[in-house]
Amino acid sequence: MTIGTLLHSTATANPNHPALCAGPDTITYGELDDSATRLARWLLDQGLRPGDRLALHWHNSIEAALLYFAAFRAGLIAVPINLRLKPAEVAFIFENSGAAMCFSAPALAPCAEHAAAACPAMRRILSAIPTAASSAAIPDVDPDRPAVILYTSGTTARPKGVVHTHRSFLEITRAGIDSHLICGGGVSLAMTPMMHAAGLAVTISAVHTGATAVLVPFDAGAVLDAIERHRCTFFFVLPALGQFLVEEQIRRPRDVSSLQIVVAGGDTVPAALQQRFHQHFGFQLQEGYGLTEGGFLAFNPSHAIRIGSIGLPLANVELRLVDPTGRDVPEGEPGEIVVRTPCMTNGYWNDPAATADLMRDGWLHTGDLAHRDPDGYLWFRGRSKQIIIRAGSNISPQEVEEALYRHPAVLEAGVVGQPDPVYGELVVAFVALRPGADVTASGLQNFAREHLADYKTPERILFLPQLPKGPTGKVDRRTLKESLRTDSAATAGA
């Protein structure tokens, strides 16, 4: 089965069931399948062929979903473009992917057009979806052919294109549904952009089960309004955005009693956020772990949540924790997470060296560190490339951030290492405070010392109105680290 035939199958069984809602607009499965088929034929009429890359530069909407499903139906490879990227960054993705055509929403089209000027292979930028009829034949698509290239910033200077086939991406959605990580029915709220693996998975999972997906750009008030209006049963949230949902629910409570599952992932979930979410939403966030290259890998089951843990490996995931030599580490000791699963990528587009580093002896090497407790639960210990080494001691940025989040004045925290000639690296924390909160850098340092060893306590705390975010909404530690070179982006607290 391919993603396109999945939609057709669901539409045949439930043609009149709402597939997607966005604002006041709704489209049924029958309408979505018919529109996607007609658009797929039009794309093929333009000279595109199966395997060609189609760039998609569009916000979460019915139009965006239609473009994705049309690309999948035509056998094209969808190349989502992050809406926050600048023209030079978009140009790199155009060039690296070899995309021949791009659909860019009207407000975003100037950026795409500027980027395309430097890319001879990019033939057309379109900011409207055509409605012309076409009789082009829809090809049979091999499930093992690429369906999407998801560009991930990771920890390198240039983004890498993660390739997923129709089969591997449908395995991701199936694994999420089978493990109850994704709600298998009801109404799913899709606020994570579809250029993010989790955002696309939520939308396709709804098609997998014949559910309805409500598409909402992230705005805390709009998200909560949509939950109340559509009686949503599920959503996925990045921890950094979860903080803002709690603040908005405190400011103006909505009826969120319809919710059954809320999954947090993409970064560690502070215990303070868990506590506040439970207080104001009435149940616990279910923390999980995954990555663009491997799909959903671990999850806290609803009947046995361990706060602070990333959960248990999913049933279809072989997961090991290994030392730098590739040997399994003892229980309780940190090791790199390596996995083998039908959900994992074929590799990075046009980057054999990075692919060889990622995939070794059939195992996907995540670069993430964790330890396993006696009951098999996994506890995230940070990324190997983000570990701060101070005087020979390893310090996890996430552990320091967790301590800072316990302070009631802290809304956001990001911790990085600053090079130092004596200690190797110093611990530096960037903090954004809650509206109306007041605390000094020394006050936060004293608070942190109550929860951390002396060598883990930040030597410096710098305040920002808000922390910079990466393309997926996570705190951008790389930008924070670069700002330390001049200190131009922050002012030290008194």
Which residue ranges define each predicted feature?
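Conserved ATP/PPi-binding loop(s) of AMP-dependent carboxylate-activating enzymes
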Residues: 312-316, 327-358, 395
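Conserved AMP-binding A3 loop
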Residues: 28-30, 147-174
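Conserved pre-ATP/AMP-binding loop-to-beta segment of ANL
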Residues: 16, 134-151, 158, 181-187
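Gly/Ser/Thr-rich phosphate-binding loop
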Residues: 208, 232-236, 246-307, 318
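Conserved AMP-binding/adenylation subdomain of ANL enzymes
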Residues: 170-187, 195-233, 248-249
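Conserved AMP-binding/adenylate-forming
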Residues: 25, 40-85, 394
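Conserved beta-loop-beta connector loops within the AMP-binding
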Residues: 320-338, 374-375, 437-441, 476
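AMP-binding/adenylate-forming catalytic core of the ANL superfamily
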Residues: 85, 102-104, 235, 341, ...
